[in-house]
A protein has these predicted regions:
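Cytochrome P450
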Residues: 1-392
Length: 392
C-alpha cells in the first residue's frame, strides 16, 4: 500500500559517526521507506535495493549532468567528466574508456599482476606484523594503475591523495572541503604538467586518450577530464575492497577455509566482499522530471542520494544481508553501479583482486588482525589501518 505520509529522517549521512560506521543509519533509512526526505541536505534518499537499481538504470530521469556530489564546488569542477555527464557527451567518453578497459584489452596485463601479487604475499608472509592497508592493498594497486596509464615516475606518490580528495569533495561543504578542493586543483596541475601529453609512456591508456583527440573523437578539455577520472577514481575503491577482504576473512575463518578448499570460488568471494563492504557508499543524481514512488512524488530538479552501500545490505533483497557468505552468488550487487554509469574500471579491479586472493590462498592458513581503523570520507567507506599477521 502506498505511503500516505512523507517519510523523513534525521539520519546524517555525512556525520563523522555515520561515515565510520554507516550501517545502523542505513538500516533506519531503509525502515523509513523506499524514498526518504533528508531535510538537512534539501535532498531525498533512496536507501533500498529496488529503487537504487531503478534510479541507476533510468539516466533520463536521474541525471548526472548537474554533478553526482552534494556540494556545488566539486560538481562544478567535475562538470563534463565521465561521472558528471549524460548522453550524448557521456556516451562518447564511455566508448573511449570501454575499449581500453574491456577484459580483452587487459589480457596482457594478467601475468604481471599475478607475479606482483605473489611477490607481495611472499614478502608479507613472514609472521611479522604489517598493515593490510598500507603494506598490502596500497602497495599493490597503485603501481598497476600508474603503469597502465603510462604515468612518469615523478609524482606517483600523490596519486592516493588525489583519489581520496575527489570522493571527499563529493560530500556537502564542510570543514574538510577546502583541503579536498586544494587537492583537486593539484590534480589538475599534475595532469597538465607532470603527466602532460608529452610525458606519458607510449602505448599507455593516457597516450591513447590523446590519440582520441588526434582522431577528432574528443577535444583537449575532454581528454583532461578523462585523465583526471583515471587518477581520481581508479584506485581507492580497489584498495578499500582488498583491505576489506583481509578483514572479513580474518573475522570469518570458516569462509577462508571454504575458499582454500575450493579456489574456484575466488570470483564469487570477491563479489561478496564488494557487496558487504561497498567502498563507494553514495552518489547523487538530479531528477529531470517528477518521479513517483510509493505514493511520494520527488519533484523535478531535486537532488537524490543514491545509496549503493545501503542497497547492498537491503533485507528485502538479500537473505541475512549482514552475513558474509562466499557462496551467496551476489552477481547483482550494486557496488559497481549499473546502467550507463556502471564502473568502467571494474574489470581491472577484478583482475587485481582475483590475483591477490589467489596468491594469498597459496600461502595463508589464516589471518590474525588487530583493531581496525576506518577512514572518514564523505562517499567512501573502508579501512585506514588494519594490523595483520599471516599464519602460513
Amino acid at each position: 500500500m502506498p505511503s500516505t505520509t512523507l517519510p523523513s529522517s534525521d539520519v546524517d549521512l555525512f556525520a563523522t559517526d555515520t561515515l565510520v560506521d554507516p550501517y545502523p543509519g542505513y538500516a533506519r533509512l531503509r525502515d523509513a521507506g523506499p524514498v526518504v526526505r533528508l531535510d538537512r541536505y534539501d535532498a531525498w534518499a533512496l536507501p533500498r535495493y529496488e529503487q537504487v537499481g531503478a534510479a541507476l538504470r533510468d539516466h533520463e530521469t536521474f541525471s548526472s549532468a548537474s554533478g553526482v556530489g552534494f556540494g556545488a564546488g566539486m560538481n562544478e569542477l567535475m562538470a563534463g567528466g565521465v561521472l558528471a555527464s549524460d548522453p550524448p557527451h557521456h556516451t562518447t567518453l564511455r566508448v573511449i574508456l570501454s575499449r581500453m578497459l574491456m577484459p580483452r584489452a587487459l589480457r596482457d596485463l594478467g601475468p604481471s599482476v599475478t607475479v606482483a601479487a605473489e611477490d607481495i604475499v611472499d614478502r608479507l608472509a613472514t609472521g611479522a606484523e604489517f598493515d593490510a592497508v598500507s603494506d598490502l592493498a596500497e602497495a599493490f594497486t597503485p603501481r598497476f594503475v600508474a603503469d597502465l596509464i603510462g604515468l612518469p615516475q615523478e609524482g606517483r606518490d600523490q596519486l592516493l591523495e588525489f583519489g581520496a580528495s575527489t570522493f571527499e569533495g563529493l560530500g556537502p561543504v564542510g570543514e574538510r572541503t577546502p583541503a579536498a578542493m586544494r587537492q583537486q586543483k593539484a590534480l589538475l596541475d599534475y595532469v597538465t604538467t607532470t603527466a602532460a601529453r608529452d610525458r606519458l609512456v607510449e602505448g599507455g591508456l593516457g597516450a591513447r586518450v590523446w590519440e582520441a583527440v588526434d582522431a577528432g573523437e574528443i577535444d583537449e578539455a575532454a581528454a583532461i577530464t578523462l585523465m583526471m577520472a583515471f587518477l581520481a577514481t581508479g584506485m581507492d575503491t580497489t584498495i578499500l575492497s582488498l583491505a576489506a577482504a583481509v578483514r572479513l576473512f580474518a573475522q570469518h575463518p570458516d569462509q577462508w577455509d571454504a575458499l582454500r578448499a575450493d579456489p574456484s570460488l575466488v570470483p564469487n568471494a570477491y563479489l561478496e566482499v564488494l557487496r558487504i563492504a561497498s567502498p563507494v557508499t553514495v552518489f547523487s543524481r538530479v531528477t529531470t522530471r517528477d518521479w513517483e514512488c510509493d505514493g511520494i512524488t520527488v519533484p523535478a530538479g531535486d537532488r537524490v542520494a543514491v545509496m549503493y552501500a545501503s542497497a547492498n545490505r537491503d533485507e528485502r533483497k538479500w537473505g541475512d544481508p549482514e552475513r558474509f557468505d562466499i557462496t551467496r552468488k551476489p552477481s547483482d550487487h550494486l557496488t559497481f553501479g549499473v546502467g550507463i554509469h556502471a564502473c568502467v574500471g571494474q574489470n581491472l579491479a577484478k583482475l587485481e583482486a582475483h590475483a591477490l586472493l589467489t596468491a594469498l590462498l597459496a600461502r595463508v592458513r589464516r589471518f590474525e588482525i588487530g583493531k581496525p581503523e576506518f577512514i572518514v570520507n564523505n562517499t567512501l567507506h573502508g579501512l585506514s589501518k588494519l594490523p595483520c599477521r599471516i599464519v602460513t
